[in-house]
Swiss-Prot record:
Topaquinone (TPQ) is generated by copper-dependent autoxidation of a specific tyrosyl residue. This is Amine oxidase [copper-containing] 2. Disulfide bonds join 398-424, 730-737. It comes from Homo sapiens (Human). It is an enzyme of class 1 (oxidoreductase). Residues 26-756 are extracellular. The lineage of its organism: Eukaryota, Metazoa, Chordata, Craniata, Vertebrata. It holds the Pfam family Cu_amine_oxidN2. The modification 2',4',5'-topaquinone is found at residue 465. The active site is at residues 380, 465. Belongs to the copper/topaquinone oxidase family. The chain crosses the membrane at residues 5-25. Keywords: Calcium, Catecholamine metabolism, Cell membrane, Copper, Cytoplasm, Disulfide bond, Glycoprotein, Membrane, Metal-binding, Oxidoreductase, Signal-anchor, TPQ, Transmembrane, Transmembrane helix. PROSITE patterns: COPPER_AMINE_OXID_1 (PS01164), COPPER_AMINE_OXID_2 (PS01165).
Amino acid sequence: MHLKIVLAFLALSLITIFALAYVLLTSPGGSSQPPHCPSVSHRAQPWPHPGQSQLFADLSREELTAVMRFLTQRLGPGLVDAAQAQPSDNCIFSVELQLPPKAAALAHLDRGSPPPAREALAIVLFGGQPQPNVSELVVGPLPHPSYMRDVTVERHGGPLPYHRRPVLRAEFTQMWRHLKEVELPKAPIFLSSTFNYNGSTLAAVHATPRGLRSGDRATWMALYHNISGVGLFLHPVGLELLLDHRALDPAHWTVQQVFYLGHYYADLGQLEREFKSGRLEVVRVPLPPPNGASSLRSRNSPGPLPPLQFSPQGSQYSVQGNLVVSSLWSFTFGHGVFSGLRIFDVRFQGERIAYEVSVQECVSIYGADSPKTMLTRYLDSSFGLGRNSRGLVRGVDCPYQATMVDIHILVGKGAVQLLPGAVCVFEEAQGLPLRRHHNYLQNHFYGGLASSALVVRSVSSVGNYDYIWDFVLYPNGALEGRVHATGYINTAFLKGGEEGLLFGNRVGERVLGTVHTHAFHFKLDLDVAGLKNWVVAEDVVFKPVAAPWNPEHWLQRPQLTRQVLGKEDLTAFSLGSPLPRYLYLASNQTNAWGHQRGYRIQIHSPLGIHIPLESDMERALSWGRYQLVVTQRKEEESQSSSIYHQNDIWTPTVTFADFINNETLLGEDLVAWVTASFLHIPHAEDIPNTVTLGNRVGFLLRPYNFFDEDPSIFSPGSVYFEKGQDAGLCSINPVACLPDLAACVPDLPPFSYHGF
């Protein structure tokens, strides 16, 4: 009996041990289930930032609502919601942050003065007046507005004619309705026989500008096959119509001309009559298949996922509203409704490097033998680089663990809109050493630092193109601005013959990928060790010198040249002209070695091409003449372009070339303006989409004697070990810690998407 008790006790003990082992092994702390990685690094010590200033933060939902309520009360009951407004109505088109004057902002940030009043800029379309116009109103102070002032003349030198207004949704809708209900019924047999049109299988793509002279509002509209899930931009049918929609009453709109296969007609009725009589040359265009070449559906079944980047010790940055802080950098980002991504008060180790770095404009100019394409000059700020940024996809548009930030906007409708995930912030591991050296002469050692950067990103989907905007901040104090282009190409119908190939490559059965240029303009308001800066150009020349130890032999010795560019005209480097290989903004402070502290500007852009100066559209695009210009900073020269240029490109409200008037640049607050551009000749590999690879341009700001040494040497991730040391020890080499530190599960948020 005693033996049975002992055996039973042993059996019970074994069961208990197995049960405990199972619990330990399967619990979150057990070896089979590693712990979750921290979301924020406990070692990250954000650099102190002077308060949580709201100077540059985009307007909140509450502020936008307060401005709308105030304007509705002040402007009276005649206002119509912009989403339904007809051309003859009054409506509030947009509301966004009015940036404060720089002097007042710096007084608050640097000297503790009260913050300047927080204000909004509203654009109001007055179509219901005897003399319709566009007005710009500043409203403040927020969040409880009590005043508004008209700044139209102050900002633009005079009133804004009504024909310059952006096209509202209701006008776009009415334009297509006019074609569908008034014009297309004039050619039912031609349309159904030639394009298989059934009332819903065609859509229009517009040319801009809308006319040929100031005051016009007439748009060439090219028809494309429109099938769900298929990129309509790749399916032109060859039919284009010129719609005059200048009249405020859509009942008075008319089609002035029709273009088909190289010929112009009075209207679709004439086209129908010639088709019925058999005199019309036609090319029948079948409907595209749903899963054809223009579809972005994968041609393969799902396979292994791409590599996942994660931070085993947690993020090295934090996002608080619009403020981003890390152990090295701090800045505030903004998201202009029209101009898009911008950053302010950019500081490295607490010292301001830049007051503002921002996108100004994005233009593409097309060529082909159809009227819609040959006229097209898209100025994308007018469509809204910011308003068209939304729905970034985790794991594709941004790393999966990126911080996704929602943006509130008010444009084109009377209610506040949420742009979910319009901006993302993340750390970028670049798979490259920022610096390294393996020494084997005299002694043996290795030192290096893996390159990583802090990135803020938005993506503007403007019509067919998608522009990926990044501002990238590095541990050595460098700041990069870059843009990648992707999306669908714009196409024209290819009639046949070699003449069509003067404007691009054939990319489909009857499809021409049309040649075009891209140009992007950036504003760099740098404050290099203060507000007083100089522009310095350095280069090298070879000079002959007799070898001192043997004068019979001559050497060609490189020698530095240095020039202070003291006037604006000296810094206006035309597109295509050579830039000094080193050009930097210098301060009146010196580093430990007696050199002026500076920041160098490098432009990453192939040799561009600008529209000829004799073009009557050129002055509105005059910023594109220059790859680089440095000017005195002025509040009245805050932007290089205007949203009103798209619909009146012949009478610009802002002419950037006029900023350059040979003023002194010696010890002044300076702004550098950078143009980055490239040529795109579409080809077969642009189908279905243009890839980002090879379609990237931008600029780089690099410290030049700003520090006494490379500040990245203080990075905690630096690696150094010598011969004889055990590089596998964590105490010697921080990279050796990774197998233990990375033994955690990334804390991944569930995937969600709200971009539609």
